[in-house]
């Protein structure tokens, strides 16, 4: 948005249906929202030693998921409003450079060609698929799957010690996974 604030014609290419990239849509923001739930559960348990007993938490996964989505929607909606207010054009899809000053975006509605003088690349990330793991197995989740919070398995193994993996381990443990 800073480019638009400085008077430059600005276009954002976004692969998700809402602005915010990986962090806001399928990364740090949904993870932090779920981590907040885990923290509240753990703090409630810890208060027992101070004489305040809440009992075992009863979790409604559907309501937790809905709340997490509400957090995401509120923030992505805010970004959409900021983009509109600054007259930033948003093109949804995946972009690839086709020339020194040309980007081709493949989206749901076909291809869009964008000509530009300057480009800022903020490509985000995506989960890696390890070749020795059967990804078609519904028990195998990547971080995006874990953030969807479809179920709380009885037991969960987290491979990888990145921040999202650590946070998801914390969340699922607080929700009852071993």
List the model feature ranges, each with a label.
Residues 2-9, 14-152:
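Glycine-rich flavin
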Residues 150-178:
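Rossmann-like NAD(P)H-binding beta-loop-alpha module
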């Amino acid at each position: 948005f800073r480019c638009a604030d400085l008077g430059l014609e600005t276009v954002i290419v976004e692969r998700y249906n809402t602005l915010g990239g990986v962090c806001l849509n399928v990364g740090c923001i949904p993870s932090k929202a779920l981590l907040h739930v885990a923290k509240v559960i753990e703090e409630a348990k810890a208060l027992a030693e101070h004489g305040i007993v809440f009992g075992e938490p009863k979790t409604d996964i559907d309501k937790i998921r809905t709340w997490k989505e509400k957090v995401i929607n509120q923030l992505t909606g805010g970004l959409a409003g900021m983009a509109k207010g600054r007259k930033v054009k948003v093109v949804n899809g995946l972009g690839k450079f086709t020339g020194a000053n040309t980007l081709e975006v493949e989206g749901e509605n076909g291809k869009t060609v964008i000509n530009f003088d300057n480009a800022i690349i903020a490509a985000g990330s995506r989960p890696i698929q390890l070749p020795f793991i059967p990804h078609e197995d519904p028990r195998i989740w990547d971080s995006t799957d874990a953030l969807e919070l479809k179920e709380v398995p009885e037991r969960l193994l987290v491979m990888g010690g990145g921040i999202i993996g650590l946070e998801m381990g914390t969340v699922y443990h607080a929700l009852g996974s071993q």
